[in-house]
């Protein structure tokens, strides 16, 4: 693997500018490439998601079924608390997760976009137990006016605001998530504030930031050559 590292580092040196999708990734760029990166988070199309006046009685996970996503934590916690959980997704971890699911947990498999939007709008909260570089699904939940209960590492720290758009659990364990779910029962959230927060990551904001960055660097380079 040594030659791959050498090639990768040499290739990075030829990059004019780095754009990272999160501060989490920008830190890795600094560490491994010793280069700075501007952070421009990926977009969520807020206009595709709607608020609902009706609160559902279930928690929601939308995820690829892979071990590192830690969907098992969400299933185990809801099993133990007897909470309703709907899980959308598919992947290599499906059989193991299906075997874990108790009577209050429903694995829906793949569903169409319209159904996913309905599930977001009607859930009590969105569970995000994995550690991701950024994570779009929490923002889709917020765009639907629903709070997020997230593992407090990685990209979730850049989208979830404690007590405003959701809450965190500190350890990636069932017990830690159970503590957060119990704490959630005592909390209240304003769905309109959740929506407003998601709109900070709207695709129109993303396009404007990308355009501004490209224009700035283009003008800097052209100005330097004149």
Model-predicted segments: where are they?
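Membrane-proximal helix-turn-helix segments that form the acceptor-binding/catalytic region
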Residues: 1-18
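Conserved donor-binding/catalytic core segment of Leloir-type glycosyltransferases
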Residues: 44, 50-69, 75-82, 86
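Nucleotide-activated donor-binding/catalytic signature segment of Leloir-type glycosyltransferases, i.e.
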Residues: 95-117
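Short alpha-helical donor nucleotide-sugar binding micro-motif in glycosyltransferases
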Residues: 118-123, 210
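Acidic donor-binding loop of glycosyltransferase active sites
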Residues: 121-133, 146
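Short hydrophobic beta-strand element within catalytic cores of glycosyltransferases
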Residues: 127, 147-151, 160
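A charged, aromatic-enriched C-terminal amphipathic alpha-helix characteristic of glycosyltransferases
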Residues: 172, 186-223
